[in-house]
Amino acid sequence: MMRTVYLLSIIFLAACSHKIVAERTTYFPKRIETMSNSIKKENVWVFIMAGQSNMAGRGVVEPEDTVSDKRILSINKDGEIIIAKEPLHFYEPERTGLDCGLSFAKTLIKKIPDSISILIIPTAVGGSSIRQWLGDSVYRNVKLFSNFLSKVEIAKQNGIIKGILWHQGESDANEKDIPLHKQRLHLLFSKFRAAVGNNELPVLLGELGSFSENPVNFNLINNTIHEYAVEDKNSRVISTKDLKDKGDHLHFNSKGQRTMGKRFANAYLSMH
């Protein structure tokens, strides 16, 4: 009897898991479109997405997120240039969802010359700490800084790197790491800019969400983000105070991701 109940429980859990995966991936792209013709490098603006899960994206891809634009590009896991379709990140296929990248590009492309295409390069890995980025740690099978460097090379081969979108800090929201966070931001972004070869490269930082079950520490991380931006004239912080979570008190929902993308774009435009 107990064995039967145990087997039925396993079958039920497997069915539930399959249903959750099916719902999460319903509107994922059915095919990947690679670029059939090359674009002049000087006509491609490249933005690199970096950080942890709220940059990698945990929102649900919905029908409105499936509309692509041939001027908005990304890469696949083999480093090939493709037409950008959500989800853009591919490092954690069992977790990946809607991020802010396509929303960012769609907002930006309305405000720049028609001759310009946008290439969004994903490098964010959920759960990664800034210390792991600085130490080039292997996290979830990704060597964080080395992977960033390899994507910078792809970016340089195909366009002009115009900025970095950064959202990270949840993994650093603890008593040990909070006092070091601002200093680590300075160190990491200096390394990012050195890799790109532009000491004035714009870096756009997103606040942590206001829906955490650990609000005190999240607020302290946000304070360090704002303090950093005061010291770096080539950075901007986007507010997320009004954005909602997906029900887990940790990750932005789909609407929040789209809004965040728009705010990143407007922050970038405000610098030019």
What are these regions (language model features)?
Residues 2-8:
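Sec-dependent signal peptide recognition
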